[in-house]
A protein has these predicted regions:
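Short Cys/His-centered divalent metal-binding micro-motifs
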Residues: 44-69
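Short cysteine-rich loop/turn motifs with clustered Cys
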Residues: 1-24
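Histidine-centered catalytic micro-motifs
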Residues: 23-31, 48-55
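Short linker/helix segments within small regulatory modules
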Residues: 29-44
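Short, solvent-exposed coil/turn linker segments
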Residues: 17-19, 59, 84
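Amphipathic alpha-helical interface surfaces
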Residues: 21-24, 43-47, 75
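Short flanking/linker segments adjacent to small metal-binding domains or redox-active Cys/His motifs
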Residues: 72-97
Length: 97
C-alpha cells in the first residue's frame, strides 16, 4: 500500500531526499499488530535514520514522544480524509485527536 502520509522519497521531518541519505520506512502505529494495519492503510512514512532511530531523544521518533504523538495525530487526520467511511478508533484501537 502506498503511504497516505508522504509519497515523495524524502524524509518527512527534514525533507532530505533519498539521494543524500538512506531512507527508512516508519510504521506510524505499532505494537499489538498495528504495524500490519499501518501498512494496510498506508499509515507509514519515509524518515532518514537520524529522525527514525539514531538521533536520540531530541530528534528520533522512536525516542521522542512529542514527535511520535504529532505523527500519530497527523496520520489519523489523513486516515479520516482518505477513508471517511471507516472508523479509525475501531480499527487501530486508539485515538490521537
Amino acid at each position: 500500500m502506498r503511504s497516505i502520509i508522504n509519497n515523495e522519497y524524502k524524509c518527512l521531518i527534514c525533507e532530505t531526499p533519498s539521494h543524500e541519505t538512506h531512507l527508512q520506512t516508519h510504521n506510524i502505529f505499532y505494537g499489538n499488530g498495528r504495524e500490519a494495519l499501518s501498512e494496510k492503510y498506508g499509515c507509514w512514512c519515509y524518515l532518514c535514520a537520524r529522525h527514525h532511530i539514531i538521533g536520540g531523544n531530541a530528534v528520533a521518533v522512536h525516542f521522542n514522544k512529542k514527535l511520535d504523538k504529532k505523527l500519530k495525530a497527523h496520520a489519523q487526520k489523513r486516515f479520516n480524509e482518505v477513508y471517511p467511511d471507516l472508523n479509525f478508533t475501531q480499527i487501530f484501537g486508539e485515538n490521537h485527536l
